[in-house]
Curated annotation (Swiss-Prot):
Name of the protein in its database record: Dual-specificity RNA methyltransferase RlmN
Signal peptide positions (record): none
Organism (species): Shewanella sp. (strain MR-7)
Enzyme class of the recorded protein, top EC level: transferase
Other comments on record: Reaction proceeds by a ping-pong mechanism involving intermediate methylation of a conserved cysteine residue.
GO MF term list: 4 iron, 4 sulfur cluster binding; metal ion binding; rRNA (adenine(2503)-C2-)-methyltransferase activity; rRNA binding; tRNA (adenine(37)-C2)-methyltransferase activity; tRNA binding
Length: 373
Protein backbone atom coordinates (compact mmCIF):
# COMPACT_ATOMS: atom_id res chain seq x y z
CA UNK A 1 0.00 0.00 0.00
CA UNK A 2 1.49 3.34 -1.10
CA UNK A 3 2.12 6.05 1.49
CA UNK A 4 -0.42 8.89 1.51
CA UNK A 5 0.98 11.99 -0.13
CA UNK A 6 1.45 15.21 1.84
CA UNK A 7 -0.95 17.95 0.71
CA UNK A 8 1.24 21.05 0.59
CA UNK A 9 -1.80 23.29 1.13
CA UNK A 10 -1.85 21.92 4.69
CA UNK A 11 1.58 23.41 5.47
CA UNK A 12 2.39 26.92 6.62
CA UNK A 13 5.90 28.23 5.95
CA UNK A 14 7.39 26.75 9.12
CA UNK A 15 6.01 23.28 8.28
CA UNK A 16 6.98 23.68 4.61
CA UNK A 17 10.59 24.48 5.55
CA UNK A 18 10.67 21.47 7.88
CA UNK A 19 9.55 19.27 4.99
CA UNK A 20 12.27 20.67 2.74
CA UNK A 21 14.89 20.13 5.44
CA UNK A 22 13.75 16.50 5.54
CA UNK A 23 14.31 16.39 1.77
CA UNK A 24 17.83 17.75 2.28
CA UNK A 25 16.94 21.11 0.76
CA UNK A 26 17.58 24.69 1.87
CA UNK A 27 14.75 26.84 3.35
CA UNK A 28 14.58 29.21 0.37
CA UNK A 29 13.34 26.33 -1.79
CA UNK A 30 10.23 26.12 0.41
CA UNK A 31 9.67 29.85 -0.08
CA UNK A 32 9.97 29.43 -3.85
CA UNK A 33 7.41 26.65 -3.81
CA UNK A 34 4.94 28.70 -1.74
CA UNK A 35 5.19 31.55 -4.27
CA UNK A 36 4.34 29.16 -7.08
CA UNK A 37 1.31 27.88 -5.19
CA UNK A 38 -0.12 31.08 -3.72
CA UNK A 39 1.11 33.87 -6.01
CA UNK A 40 0.73 32.04 -9.31
CA UNK A 41 -1.85 29.34 -8.55
CA UNK A 42 0.36 26.51 -9.85
CA UNK A 43 -0.32 22.94 -8.72
CA UNK A 44 1.84 21.04 -11.24
CA UNK A 45 5.44 20.69 -10.05
CA UNK A 46 6.67 20.52 -13.67
CA UNK A 47 5.57 24.14 -14.19
CA UNK A 48 7.83 25.38 -11.37
CA UNK A 49 10.71 26.31 -13.63
CA UNK A 50 13.10 27.75 -11.01
CA UNK A 51 13.05 24.46 -9.06
CA UNK A 52 15.49 21.85 -10.36
CA UNK A 53 14.21 18.69 -12.00
CA UNK A 54 15.49 16.31 -9.29
CA UNK A 55 13.66 18.24 -6.57
CA UNK A 56 10.51 18.43 -8.70
CA UNK A 57 10.60 14.64 -8.99
CA UNK A 58 11.10 14.26 -5.23
CA UNK A 59 8.14 16.54 -4.57
CA UNK A 60 5.91 14.72 -7.05
CA UNK A 61 6.73 11.39 -5.39
CA UNK A 62 5.92 12.54 -1.84
CA UNK A 63 3.59 15.52 -2.16
CA UNK A 64 0.52 16.89 -3.87
CA UNK A 65 -1.27 20.24 -4.13
CA UNK A 66 -5.00 19.58 -3.81
CA UNK A 67 -7.72 22.11 -3.02
CA UNK A 68 -11.41 21.23 -2.60
CA UNK A 69 -13.40 21.66 -5.79
CA UNK A 70 -16.12 24.22 -6.50
CA UNK A 71 -19.32 22.18 -6.95
CA UNK A 72 -21.49 25.08 -8.10
CA UNK A 73 -21.92 28.81 -7.77
CA UNK A 74 -24.64 31.45 -7.85
CA UNK A 75 -24.23 35.12 -8.73
CA UNK A 76 -26.36 37.80 -7.08
CA UNK A 77 -27.73 40.85 -8.84
CA UNK A 78 -25.32 42.93 -6.71
CA UNK A 79 -22.24 41.00 -7.93
CA UNK A 80 -21.88 38.78 -4.85
CA UNK A 81 -21.00 35.17 -5.73
CA UNK A 82 -21.78 32.21 -3.48
CA UNK A 83 -19.66 29.09 -4.04
CA UNK A 84 -20.52 25.59 -2.89
CA UNK A 85 -17.22 23.86 -2.06
CA UNK A 86 -17.13 20.05 -2.00
CA UNK A 87 -15.25 18.71 1.04
CA UNK A 88 -15.86 14.97 0.66
CA UNK A 89 -18.49 12.43 1.72
CA UNK A 90 -21.16 14.32 -0.21
CA UNK A 91 -20.73 17.40 1.96
CA UNK A 92 -20.35 21.03 0.95
CA UNK A 93 -19.46 24.26 2.68
CA UNK A 94 -20.24 27.71 1.34
CA UNK A 95 -17.85 30.54 0.54
CA UNK A 96 -18.95 34.02 -0.49
CA UNK A 97 -17.14 36.55 -2.70
CA UNK A 98 -18.20 40.16 -2.10
CA UNK A 99 -16.83 42.72 -4.60
CA UNK A 100 -16.79 46.43 -3.77
CA UNK A 101 -15.23 49.48 -5.41
CA UNK A 102 -12.19 49.53 -3.12
CA UNK A 103 -11.88 45.88 -2.08
CA UNK A 104 -12.79 42.28 -2.86
CA UNK A 105 -13.69 40.25 0.22
CA UNK A 106 -13.96 36.48 0.56
CA UNK A 107 -16.05 35.09 3.42
CA UNK A 108 -14.47 31.75 4.34
CA UNK A 109 -15.85 28.76 6.28
CA UNK A 110 -13.93 27.00 9.07
CA UNK A 111 -16.20 24.02 9.88
CA UNK A 112 -18.63 21.68 8.14
CA UNK A 113 -21.69 23.09 9.89
CA UNK A 114 -21.31 24.66 13.31
CA UNK A 115 -21.01 23.20 16.79
CA UNK A 116 -22.68 26.25 18.34
CA UNK A 117 -26.43 26.69 18.25
CA UNK A 118 -27.09 30.40 17.68
CA UNK A 119 -30.83 30.54 17.14
CA UNK A 120 -30.81 33.20 14.38
CA UNK A 121 -28.25 31.48 12.12
CA UNK A 122 -29.07 29.10 9.27
CA UNK A 123 -25.73 27.26 9.55
CA UNK A 124 -26.46 26.40 13.19
CA UNK A 125 -29.74 24.77 12.22
CA UNK A 126 -27.89 22.33 9.94
CA UNK A 127 -25.90 20.74 12.76
CA UNK A 128 -22.19 19.93 12.78
CA UNK A 129 -19.99 17.29 11.16
CA UNK A 130 -16.29 18.17 11.51
CA UNK A 131 -13.59 20.81 11.39
CA UNK A 132 -12.13 21.81 8.05
CA UNK A 133 -8.45 21.06 7.46
CA UNK A 134 -5.88 23.76 6.69
CA UNK A 135 -5.99 22.83 2.99
CA UNK A 136 -9.79 23.04 2.98
CA UNK A 137 -9.67 26.53 4.52
CA UNK A 138 -6.91 28.04 2.34
CA UNK A 139 -8.22 25.95 -0.55
CA UNK A 140 -11.37 28.08 -0.60
CA UNK A 141 -9.25 31.16 -1.30
CA UNK A 142 -7.09 29.27 -3.82
CA UNK A 143 -10.08 27.91 -5.76
CA UNK A 144 -11.94 31.22 -5.86
CA UNK A 145 -8.73 32.98 -6.92
CA UNK A 146 -8.52 30.50 -9.81
CA UNK A 147 -12.16 31.19 -10.66
CA UNK A 148 -11.59 34.96 -10.67
CA UNK A 149 -8.07 34.90 -12.14
CA UNK A 150 -4.78 35.16 -10.27
CA UNK A 151 -2.91 38.48 -10.39
CA UNK A 152 -0.42 37.02 -12.90
CA UNK A 153 -3.35 36.66 -15.35
CA UNK A 154 -5.42 39.76 -14.55
CA UNK A 155 -2.89 42.28 -13.20
CA UNK A 156 -5.06 42.74 -10.10
CA UNK A 157 -5.20 40.88 -6.81
CA UNK A 158 -8.45 38.83 -6.99
CA UNK A 159 -9.05 38.88 -3.22
CA UNK A 160 -7.90 41.77 -1.00
CA UNK A 161 -9.67 40.83 2.25
CA UNK A 162 -10.60 37.58 3.99
CA UNK A 163 -13.19 37.30 6.74
CA UNK A 164 -13.52 34.12 8.77
CA UNK A 165 -17.28 34.63 8.98
CA UNK A 166 -18.54 31.70 6.94
CA UNK A 167 -19.83 28.41 8.30
CA UNK A 168 -18.52 27.41 11.73
CA UNK A 169 -16.91 28.91 14.84
CA UNK A 170 -13.23 29.51 13.95
CA UNK A 171 -12.02 29.37 17.55
CA UNK A 172 -13.31 25.79 17.85
CA UNK A 173 -10.91 24.83 15.03
CA UNK A 174 -7.89 26.78 16.19
CA UNK A 175 -5.37 24.04 15.34
CA UNK A 176 -6.21 24.47 11.64
CA UNK A 177 -7.35 28.10 11.58
CA UNK A 178 -4.05 29.48 12.91
CA UNK A 179 -1.81 27.89 10.23
CA UNK A 180 -4.42 28.75 7.58
CA UNK A 181 -4.35 32.41 8.61
CA UNK A 182 -0.54 32.25 8.75
CA UNK A 183 -0.63 31.32 5.06
CA UNK A 184 -3.05 34.18 4.33
CA UNK A 185 -0.66 36.66 5.99
CA UNK A 186 2.66 35.20 4.78
CA UNK A 187 4.53 37.19 2.12
CA UNK A 188 5.09 33.88 0.32
CA UNK A 189 1.44 32.89 0.84
CA UNK A 190 -1.54 35.07 -0.07
CA UNK A 191 0.37 38.09 1.31
CA UNK A 192 -2.61 39.83 2.93
CA UNK A 193 -2.26 42.60 5.50
CA UNK A 194 -3.16 41.63 9.07
CA UNK A 195 -5.76 44.42 9.01
CA UNK A 196 -7.37 42.74 6.00
CA UNK A 197 -7.83 39.33 7.63
CA UNK A 198 -10.69 39.25 10.14
CA UNK A 199 -11.72 36.47 12.49
CA UNK A 200 -15.26 36.53 13.87
CA UNK A 201 -16.13 34.68 17.08
CA UNK A 202 -19.15 34.10 19.30
CA UNK A 203 -16.93 34.00 22.37
CA UNK A 204 -14.91 30.86 23.10
CA UNK A 205 -12.76 32.77 25.58
CA UNK A 206 -9.86 30.33 26.28
CA UNK A 207 -9.32 29.90 22.53
CA UNK A 208 -9.41 33.68 22.06
CA UNK A 209 -6.52 33.97 24.51
CA UNK A 210 -4.60 31.29 22.57
CA UNK A 211 -5.24 33.16 19.32
CA UNK A 212 -3.86 36.34 20.88
CA UNK A 213 -0.64 34.53 21.79
CA UNK A 214 -0.26 33.09 18.28
CA UNK A 215 -1.48 35.63 15.75
CA UNK A 216 -2.48 39.25 15.22
CA UNK A 217 -5.51 39.74 12.97
CA UNK A 218 -8.57 41.96 13.01
CA UNK A 219 -11.22 40.72 15.45
CA UNK A 220 -15.01 40.86 15.12
CA UNK A 221 -17.14 39.70 18.04
CA UNK A 222 -20.71 38.41 17.82
CA UNK A 223 -22.49 40.10 20.73
CA UNK A 224 -26.13 40.25 19.48
CA UNK A 225 -27.66 40.94 22.92
CA UNK A 226 -27.08 43.59 25.61
CA UNK A 227 -27.41 41.22 28.58
CA UNK A 228 -26.75 37.61 29.57
CA UNK A 229 -30.41 36.69 29.90
CA UNK A 230 -31.15 37.34 26.22
CA UNK A 231 -27.74 36.25 24.95
CA UNK A 232 -28.15 32.86 26.67
CA UNK A 233 -31.08 32.32 24.27
CA UNK A 234 -29.63 33.81 21.09
CA UNK A 235 -26.01 32.65 21.53
CA UNK A 236 -26.07 29.62 23.88
CA UNK A 237 -22.27 29.53 24.29
CA UNK A 238 -22.91 32.55 26.53
CA UNK A 239 -24.00 30.14 29.27
CA UNK A 240 -20.40 28.90 29.40
CA UNK A 241 -18.65 32.22 28.72
CA UNK A 242 -20.93 35.09 29.86
CA UNK A 243 -20.65 38.60 28.49
CA UNK A 244 -18.31 40.07 31.11
CA UNK A 245 -15.92 37.13 30.72
CA UNK A 246 -16.08 37.49 26.93
CA UNK A 247 -15.49 41.25 27.10
CA UNK A 248 -12.47 40.76 29.37
CA UNK A 249 -11.04 38.32 26.81
CA UNK A 250 -11.66 40.84 24.02
CA UNK A 251 -9.80 43.55 25.93
CA UNK A 252 -6.87 41.18 26.49
CA UNK A 253 -6.74 40.46 22.76
CA UNK A 254 -6.85 44.05 21.53
CA UNK A 255 -4.25 45.07 24.12
CA UNK A 256 -1.79 42.76 22.30
CA UNK A 257 -2.97 43.61 18.80
CA UNK A 258 -1.76 46.11 16.22
CA UNK A 259 -4.24 44.90 13.59
CA UNK A 260 -7.23 46.19 15.57
CA UNK A 261 -5.82 49.67 16.18
CA UNK A 262 -7.03 49.60 19.75
CA UNK A 263 -10.65 48.63 19.16
CA UNK A 264 -12.78 45.67 18.15
CA UNK A 265 -15.76 45.36 15.78
CA UNK A 266 -18.98 44.43 17.58
CA UNK A 267 -21.48 42.51 15.45
CA UNK A 268 -25.11 42.90 16.44
CA UNK A 269 -27.86 41.27 14.38
CA UNK A 270 -31.10 43.29 14.40
CA UNK A 271 -34.04 41.02 15.29
CA UNK A 272 -37.47 42.59 15.18
CA UNK A 273 -38.81 43.29 18.71
CA UNK A 274 -36.24 40.89 20.19
CA UNK A 275 -33.06 42.91 20.70
CA UNK A 276 -33.75 46.19 18.89
CA UNK A 277 -35.51 48.51 21.36
CA UNK A 278 -34.10 51.89 22.36
CA UNK A 279 -33.81 50.59 25.93
CA UNK A 280 -31.64 47.73 24.67
CA UNK A 281 -29.53 50.23 22.71
CA UNK A 282 -28.84 52.15 25.94
CA UNK A 283 -28.03 48.83 27.64
CA UNK A 284 -25.62 47.83 24.85
CA UNK A 285 -23.82 51.18 25.01
CA UNK A 286 -23.40 50.79 28.77
CA UNK A 287 -22.18 47.22 28.32
CA UNK A 288 -19.45 48.30 25.89
CA UNK A 289 -18.31 51.42 27.77
CA UNK A 290 -15.02 49.85 28.91
CA UNK A 291 -14.31 48.01 25.64
CA UNK A 292 -13.14 50.23 22.75
CA UNK A 293 -15.23 49.28 19.73
CA UNK A 294 -17.15 50.20 16.65
CA UNK A 295 -20.60 48.65 16.27
CA UNK A 296 -21.75 46.88 13.12
CA UNK A 297 -25.56 46.59 13.07
CA UNK A 298 -26.61 43.71 10.81
CA UNK A 299 -30.19 43.63 9.50
CA UNK A 300 -31.36 40.04 10.04
CA UNK A 301 -31.49 37.92 6.89
CA UNK A 302 -34.40 35.47 7.19
CA UNK A 303 -34.00 31.84 6.12
CA UNK A 304 -36.66 29.09 5.74
CA UNK A 305 -38.11 28.17 9.13
CA UNK A 306 -36.50 31.08 10.95
CA UNK A 307 -38.39 32.13 14.11
CA UNK A 308 -37.28 35.77 13.76
CA UNK A 309 -38.03 38.76 11.57
CA UNK A 310 -35.83 41.62 10.38
CA UNK A 311 -36.00 44.88 12.33
CA UNK A 312 -37.61 47.73 10.41
CA UNK A 313 -35.37 50.47 9.07
CA UNK A 314 -36.93 52.91 11.52
CA UNK A 315 -36.08 50.69 14.51
CA UNK A 316 -32.53 50.19 13.24
CA UNK A 317 -32.19 53.95 12.77
CA UNK A 318 -33.41 54.71 16.30
CA UNK A 319 -31.12 52.03 17.77
CA UNK A 320 -28.16 53.45 15.84
CA UNK A 321 -28.83 57.02 17.00
CA UNK A 322 -28.89 55.98 20.66
CA UNK A 323 -25.48 54.30 20.30
CA UNK A 324 -24.05 57.36 18.57
CA UNK A 325 -25.25 59.54 21.45
CA UNK A 326 -22.72 57.63 23.56
CA UNK A 327 -19.95 58.47 21.10
CA UNK A 328 -19.86 55.03 19.48
CA UNK A 329 -19.03 54.62 15.80
CA UNK A 330 -21.95 52.76 14.22
CA UNK A 331 -22.18 51.16 10.79
CA UNK A 332 -25.35 49.57 9.43
CA UNK A 333 -24.14 46.70 7.27
CA UNK A 334 -25.39 46.77 3.72
CA UNK A 335 -27.06 43.45 2.95
CA UNK A 336 -25.29 41.67 0.10
CA UNK A 337 -26.29 38.49 -1.73
CA UNK A 338 -29.59 37.88 0.09
CA UNK A 339 -31.28 36.97 -3.22
CA UNK A 340 -29.02 33.87 -3.38
CA UNK A 341 -29.04 33.15 0.39
CA UNK A 342 -25.45 34.36 0.66
CA UNK A 343 -26.00 37.10 3.25
CA UNK A 344 -24.90 37.03 6.88
CA UNK A 345 -26.52 34.13 8.75
CA UNK A 346 -27.89 32.45 5.61
CA UNK A 347 -25.08 30.02 4.75
CA UNK A 348 -26.12 26.38 5.04
CA UNK A 349 -24.15 24.07 2.76
CA UNK A 350 -24.79 20.33 2.64
CA UNK A 351 -23.94 18.68 5.96
CA UNK A 352 -24.18 15.23 7.52
CA UNK A 353 -25.06 16.26 11.06
CA UNK A 354 -23.18 14.18 13.64
CA UNK A 355 -24.92 16.04 16.49
CA UNK A 356 -28.37 14.78 15.36
CA UNK A 357 -29.57 18.33 16.00
CA UNK A 358 -32.07 18.33 13.14
CA UNK A 359 -33.50 14.95 14.12
CA UNK A 360 -33.93 16.06 17.73
CA UNK A 361 -35.58 19.29 16.62
CA UNK A 362 -38.05 17.44 14.39
CA UNK A 363 -38.82 14.98 17.21
CA UNK A 364 -39.55 17.88 19.58
CA UNK A 365 -41.76 19.55 16.97
CA UNK A 366 -43.66 16.28 16.44
CA UNK A 367 -44.15 15.86 20.20
CA UNK A 368 -45.51 19.40 20.45
CA UNK A 369 -47.83 18.74 17.51
CA UNK A 370 -49.14 15.51 19.10
CA UNK A 371 -49.72 17.28 22.43
CA UNK A 372 -51.64 20.10 20.74
CA UNK A 373 -53.82 17.63 18.87
Amino acid sequence: MSEKKINLLDLDRKAMRALFADLGEKPFRADQLMKWIYHFGVSDFEEMTNINKVLRQKLAARCEIVAPEISSYQKSTDGTIKFAIHVGEGQEVETVYIPEDDRATLCVSSQVGCALECTFCSTAQQGFNRNLTVSEIVGQIWRVSHFLGFAKDTGERPITNVVMMGMGEPLLNLANVIPAMDIMLDDFGFSLSKRRVTLSTSGVVPALDKLGDALDVALAVSIHAPNDELRDILVPVNKKYPLQEFLAGIRRYIAKSNANRGRVTVEYVMLDHINDSTEQAHELAQLMKDTPCKVNLIPFNPYPGSPYGRSSNSRIDRFSKVLMEYGLTVIVRKTRGDDIDAACGQLAGDIRDRTKRLAKKRMQENQISVTMN
